[in-house]
Amino acid sequence: MTRQLFVTTALPYANGKFHIGHIMEYIQADIWVRFQRLMGHQVHFVGADDAHGAPIMIAAEKAGKTPQQFVADIAAGRREYLDGFHISFDNWHSTDGPENHELAQSIYRALRDNGLIEVRSIEQFFDPEKGMFLPDRFIKGECPKCGAKDQYGDSCEVCGAVYTPTEVRNPYSALSGATPVLKSSDHYFFKLSDPRCAAYLEQWTHEGGKLQQEVINKVKEWFTKDDEGKGGLGDWDISRDAPYFGIEIPDAPGKYFYVWLDAPIGYLASLKNYFDKGGPRAKYGEARSFDEFIADPAVEQYHFIGKDITYFHTLFWPATLHFSGRKTPNNVFVHGFMTVNNGEKMSKSRGTGLDPLKYLSLGMNAEWLRYYIAAKLNAHVEDVDFNPDDFVSRVNADLVGKYINIASRAAGFLAKRFGGRLSSDLGVDGMSLLETLRAHRDTLTGLYEAREFGKALREVMGLADRVNEYVDANKPWELAKKEGADAVLHDVCSVCIEAFRLLTIYLKPVLPALAAQVESFLQVEPLTFAQAHRALGAHTIGSYQHLMQRVDPKLLDALFEPPAVEAVEPGGEDIAAEIRIDDFSKVDLRIAKIVKAEAVEGSDKLLRLTLDVGEGRTRNVFSGIKGAYKPEDLEGKFIVMVANLAPRKMKFGISEGMVLAASHADEKAQPGLFVLEPHAGATPGMRVR
């Protein structure tokens, strides 16, 4: 029975180039899609750029472009990656397309009519200089849990804490450096806490193998409430205030859908765009409209995603679809991240970053990487580690040494001695070997279906070992010199080519370009899994051309070579002229405690600080940090000050020292002012040496 599948990968955010994590996911999904096509199924494989949100709006403004043009320019570079790594999307679209506007608003109305949308007034940070509400990631400040500086408004990269932006200490706008103010605004919430949603999601996440067991275990945590009734599913804020680049919420002027509401709907929008362009009709003779197709219970819907976006795809997305009257996914396939050298996080500056375009520009074969990634992938949520030495070994030993060599060891004899024609009488041993290879077809199709690509490739290479054992046992190079052994030589070489064809069928989902070369060499129609049970017989093949080069280890050195670092001025300015230690020792730096902080009337920049420097009295110091700190947030903090600076008479009084703070030389380009704080344990009066 022919299956009909709708397959997607996570939508990349349209503010930058693809990274290796994107390519890994596309390769994983593409292998599965190509396998399904080779099994004779109808697959609609679509992608799109995630085009909305404040980050894109702000990046476009900095680039002097409209958001639409900014996104279009990013999208124009996608094809180089997708073609380069043989990713076979049927359609690539954008969440800013008219289809997504229509679908997002339609789905929202259905949720609203179902009583699952609620309007609430909330307080959120507003940048008075930019005149806009700030997204969580554009608010920075001190972590409310551990006190780490310069953390984002929703989570701490130091201690891992998650919090709301209003909990951040000493917040500032990452856009302007201004201190944000709290303003009230009506926001629209999807009531995920509604008992109907909770009941449905409890059922959906546990039925029919929709999720991997590791994912189910994680989802259970999100359902769980503590002894005080806290936790469990929370309502989802799906709105953002103008100015915002996104889709307007119906009947709510100045309100836009949060990007995570319309982004997954972009899966449907890309499919609709594909249908509207006539793609399925041209490819499969599909006569139905998008609406008819997507409503068909027999249509299977699959999403490949990274583990970092599991929450959205296993809770919000199925609930959004179900309660808007739409079909939910059959499966959400979650994968891990890509690391390098036994789990090290990738970093371009350290020379541990794998740049996909650099890989291609070095002339490295895309199918080396496809094979290597596939060999590491399984159906679990595990990270994939790229080890350069392992990469060279697997490609050279497996692909070239075991698989390609089979054809090269036989094709020359067939061409020279038999005009390229295969024998139809393959002998008992040869037939037994080929039957062994054919018998693995169902095992391999089961492994591909289950996304156990690593196991599948180990099976194939095990079969390649058997073929090479057959070659070594029969020694065609000796048969070619032996008088009267032509018939045996013909049979042995024909068995090798037939075995090579079977192995190529089994590898074709992973190595489509190489398979196309093999099809040309064998002079056969495109290979499918159904052909594994058929033999070529007395068939004439073409002349053998070299199919794949070995990996030169020097290419890996070049791939991971750190980019040349441009000479830059640290902090935006040259290091000051060199001084002697005696000069530095003249400056007396001391720890001080801020006893009191208050604004200075008539000054936009100054705060009046009352400091305890451990002298038995307090000092009065004026500091130009008003734009970065609220007075009430400074009281009780420990700072570093210049204690032996001569008192200076100012318009507002006498300043008895200087508080140390850091900033970039160009504060407009890189805003932010950061008072220096000592580690816990320092006390007033301690000298900084």
UniProtKB/Swiss-Prot annotation:
Which molecular-function annotations from GO does this UniProt entry contain? ATP binding; metal ion binding; methionine-tRNA ligase activity; tRNA binding
Q: Give binding positions for Zn(2+).
A: 143, 146, 156, 159
Q: Write one Pfam family the protein is assigned to.
A: tRNA-synt_1g
* Cofactor mode of binding and number, as noted: Binds 1 zinc ion per subunit.
Where the record places motif 'KMSKS' region is: 345-349
Specify whether Nucleotide-binding is a keyword of the entry. yes
**UniProt keyword Iron present:** no
Cellular component GO terms held in the UniProt record: cytosol
Essential cofactor(s): Zn(2+)
Q: What class of enzyme is it?
A: ligase
Span of the annotated motif 'HIGH' region: 12-22
Per UniProt, the keywords (alphabetical) are: Aminoacyl-tRNA synthetase, ATP-binding, Cytoplasm, Ligase, Metal-binding, Nucleotide-binding, Protein biosynthesis, RNA-binding, tRNA-binding, Zinc
Assembly: Homodimer.
Function description: Is required not only for elongation of protein synthesis but also for the initiation of all mRNA translation through initiator tRNA(fMet) aminoacylation.
Name this protein carries in UniProt: Methionine--tRNA ligase
Give the species this sequence originates from: Leptothrix cholodnii (strain ATCC 51168 / LMG 8142 / SP-6)
